[in-house]
Amino acid sequence: MLKPERPSNPIEKPSILILGTRGIPASHGGFETFAERLALFLAGRGWKVGVYCQKEVERVGERVTIDTWRGIELITIEVASRGPRATLEFDWQCVLDAARRPGVCLVLGYNGAVFLTWLRLMRRRIITNMDGIEWRRPKWGPAARAWFWLNEWIGAWLSQRLIADHPAIADHLATRRPRSAIATIAYGADPVTSAPEEPVRALGLEPGKYLVSIARIEPDNNILPIIEAFRRRDRGDMKLVVLGTLNDEIPYHRAVREAAGTTVIMPGAIYDQATVKALRYHARAYMHGHTVGGTNPSLVEALAAGNMVIAHDNRYNRWVAGEAAIYFNDTDSLSARIDEALADDALVARCSKAARARAREAFRWEDVLSAYEK
């Protein structure tokens, strides 16, 4: 897949530059975790790996600095902008720098694909993981949707190869490029076979006595319906834990907080992976309300932890979770699925077994990373 550019010197290592994330070591989302895993894997296989990292500063001093972490070059780009402008500044500066360095350019996401024009003019090999169909998300206004739609087209045509993380995304990309230019490679997760109880108890929870949701607090992730369905009736000593950053300046976030009540625990975003793994492992079930996107990393990680999943019924989640999940379409059906999960131990056990089997079948890191290298 990566097909390294032929080194000018036979003893040189093949090279790859990874663009499109905030950087590694991972402390944010799925793309950062993936970039870290792929970088370590390829470095261990003899590749020269560079990963671009974003650093926000008040005033740009030294625009580009390079450090080494576990055999990987961390190429840090200073940006003085904030918000969306910071992302655009970072993406553009990454492209300018990458054009001067040898190696395949692996771009994660297409939100700044317009800048890839410069890499093509410099005759660089570009492979882009196209992520989800961002412009379809209802949270965006017309201008943002137009920007994402345009960049999706540009990214599809400027990249020599496209990677889809889900068959439905591959089908969508096939309306942009020939199938021969598209590879389908999912996301990976490590199996979780044990986890300490202390991180769970530190949040005032009892193992097996809570449901958990880990997602951005956004309408298309159904966070508010999940809370409303859970609180529709008395759940006894069962709790709901919702992980995600809340900003009370955002109306939807205020509505979520107001709906939570005392039986919904909202600790914010937690980036400590040991704590997150423990919360998944000891949960009665994992709540997954995502309605758009491809293979969601959090859902894959729930399967690898052996979670029974209660998921929104759509083609993305159906392909990922399969028989490991029970599905809902609205608040009424979600409340009913919660009833089933709390009442039926045998159902939970069957779904948990199916979750681990599905994770082994389709989402092993070794298989995912090897597919990228090929």
Go through each PLM region and give its residues.
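Nucleotide-activated donor-binding/catalytic signature segment of Leloir-type glycosyltransferases, i.e.
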Residues: 253-274
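Conserved donor-binding/catalytic core segment of Leloir-type glycosyltransferases
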Residues: 17, 204-232, 241
